[in-house]
Amino acid sequence: NWKVYPGDVGYDSGHTWIILGQCKDKSAVIVHSTPNAGVQISGTPTPSGSYSSQAITLAQKYMSRYAGYTKYDYHTSSGNYIRRGNYFRWNRSTLSDPDGYLNMTADQILADLFN
C-alpha cells in the first residue's frame, strides 16, 4: 500500500523524519536534519526503488532556491524512507487540519508553503 500522510513522523534506529506529502508515484517529500547541513527537504525514491521520483524532483525544485543547496551539498534524494522505519500518525479527531493538507499531494502542499 505504502500510504503516508502529511505530518506522519517516521523513525528508525538513529534517524527521524516528517512527511510533508506524498506524490502520485507513491514517493514522499520529507523534512529532516543532518549534522552537516541542518534541516532540509528531501524526496524519497518510489516504493519500488526508482530514484527518478516525483518527490526527488520536487525537493530539487524547492531546495535549489537556497544558498545551502550548493554550499552544504544538500542531498535532495534520501533513502527509501517509505519502506523503512516505523511511523507515528496523528489522531485525526485530536489534531485539526485547517489547511486541508491531508487531502493534498506533495506538490500542492509545497506550493502552499513556499508561495
Indicate residue ranges for each PLM-predicted region.
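Low-complexity, Gly/Ser/Thr/Pro-rich intrinsically disordered linker/tail segments
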Residues: 47-115
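...with weaker cross-activation on analogous glycine-rich loops/strands in unrelated enzymes
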Residues: 1-46
